[in-house]
């Protein structure tokens, strides 16, 4: 702790001091609330709503509202919020992150700001890490909200649109980050405003906020349709990279988890694929296939990053060790792994809509979160999300003993020592929770314990209900539980009878995670609410963290000591070195996330423009004005492009202009060419615009005004959707190749921003042109109806750029030879099927 902190207290301590007077006000109301009957307590909700309508703010009524929730909770749930929980509730209401240790009752804390903000009628979203916790919390806390007259909803995967809409219209809605994010994307793909399910994003409380806003931050949610690219390219690229020689043709940067071709590798690629310059922008697609094949073969490890089960490649969650069935790496990485493992390669999908959690959660009016471990990432929360981290004091002091790390020379010696330590604790009945970094390590320790005859359970659950059940019993006497570091998060481990007397729950970490936060979470499973407990990390010089990031000095010290395989050292120097290695990785990961946010912000701004335009089309009764503006823009651009006053053949320029506009919006026979040649540019634009408007008015006479207004909306929505989907794909391709600009001393993010903006402008022009063309050529007998441009086939997490990305969903409704539903009379494959 620095000198200033020692004198003035930490930032959190000073902020908590400021909050304590509000807590005193709540406590002063305790006796008043106790005297109220149930009906009088319930009536407070109506009173608060009236006061808010009359101009008071939620801050004005906070002490009373919190006091009401506290008393209602005591009556309904038999749980009364203590002072530290009130502090946590105030921190959340203020739009900050409350760091609260395991067992401090975060679920109950959330009821305070949820009730207070629910009184506004604008909706409160409480985000949990899985469906099981969402259902559990909504059911338990829903009793409390219901008693006070507020409604509770829960969003889980299997709900219909009607059920989702009802849940979102509740005062307080529980659900997972995935479900909320996908619903946002789907709402921006609907063709009738009545199909939307979400309201405006008002206030959210994110449970396990570090997991969602940091660990999952780079993971985009992707709604996808069926792609058209052949899977053969993946096989060819896979065959090519398997012929490469390490260090000669490619190098691996383990710190960045990247594989790169050397100059020799570039030359080999040019020879194999018969291209002149592999790094050329025109070879961006080839680079994409080769890059993903390199990563699949030399960076992704079977049984660590993914498993092959029944002919399918299944992702292993790097934080929980769970199999993530149904989730696919995006960007073709999953297909590259399928080629590597020689299993059936699924067709690459086409992205229809996508957003990262970083950008989804930044759209809320007020964002808050709670977790047991956030302080180590305080800078990132502040810089990316504008969130403060406030450490809330524990209700009882933490008495858990955190032992120094034990460092072993080899992995084998370390695992033997871990098993011996477990057996010793088991002999006296002390419960043990063993944290591993992978399923593979869990199974190795399990097999060694079996040989020793130590009964144990391995937490490798696919079902969160089962996982929660196992974790609940992990604190009972004699219980040994092996789990990946983050498994069972959100479920308390309560100590069984007689366990306190023998030292409480013993935590054994079998490896340091690259993030200190994950290690702290594992430690925090023990010592809840002032219970005794202890934690120790067992480390070997062969662990990934030590091998890749640890200093050579440490390796030298251990070698000099001449340790036996099962001997360990405890050293402050080693512990400091490990912490420095972790800080290095955390800093590196933060930089990656910041860089990716630079890319993603470009798409985010563009997404906002498109979704805003879509919403206006859906909401608006009349988009005719917008169509006429587009018509003028199309004509103006055409005149600027074709009519150059210094042109050698002025008349020929006009002929090209008239021919171009004839295809879009003005019949040739309507234009007086000789008269045009005598006009200025502005006069030409005005004249052609008048001709086009006259033509459009004739079109209106063929239809009723009401019918044409609907057709305008249909055509505009279709143009926006098809062009936006193509644009997403083009931006993906741009991002794939942009990294090579660094070789030309160009900042890739800056280049992406500039070129992406130019592409966006082109897309907007293309939307205008397409919309105008379709409307000026529409026929009564072929008037288009509202149909989705593409049908969702999948919603998945794509792949983190340079790790796994996020979720995806799919679109395929019409046969390729069916008549296109848009009314053109063409076959689907020759019409909208090209876009879908």
Swiss-Prot record:
Binding, ATP: 85, 103-107, 492
UniProtKB keywords: ATP-binding, Cell membrane, Cytoplasm, Membrane, Metal-binding, Nucleotide-binding, Protein transport, Translocase, Translocation, Transport, Zinc
Residues spanning the membrane: none
GO MF annotation list: ATP binding; metal ion binding; protein-exporting ATPase activity
Record has DNA damage as a keyword: no
CDD domains in the record: DEXDc_SecA, SF2_C_secA
First-level EC class: translocase
Cofactor(s) essential for the protein: Zn(2+)
Pfam families to which the protein is assigned, alphabetical: P-loop_SecA, SEC-C, SecA_DEAD, SecA_PP_bind, SecA_SW
Topology of the protein relative to the lipid bilayer: Peripheral membrane protein
One GO biological process term: protein transport by the Sec complex
Cofactor note: May bind 1 zinc ion per subunit.
Subcellular location: Cell membrane; Cytoplasm
GO CC aspect terms: cell envelope Sec protein transport complex; cytosol; plasma membrane
Catalysed reactions listed for this entry: ATP + H2O + cellular proteinSide 1 = ADP + phosphate + cellular proteinSide 2
E.C. code: 7.4.2.8
Record-listed Zn(2+) binding positions: 820, 822, 831-832
PROSITE patterns per the UniProt record, alphabetical: SECA, SECA_MOTOR_DEAD
Tagged with keyword Nucleotide-binding: yes
Family: Belongs to the SecA family.
Function: Part of the Sec protein translocase complex. Interacts with the SecYEG preprotein conducting channel. Has a central role in coupling the hydrolysis of ATP to the transfer of proteins into and across the cell membrane, serving as an ATP-driven molecular motor driving the stepwise translocation of polypeptide chains across the membrane.
HAMAP family recorded: SecA
Quaternary context: Monomer and homodimer. Part of the essential Sec protein translocation apparatus which comprises SecA, SecYEG and auxiliary proteins SecDF. Other proteins may also be involved.
Name this polypeptide is given: Protein translocase subunit SecA
Gene: secA
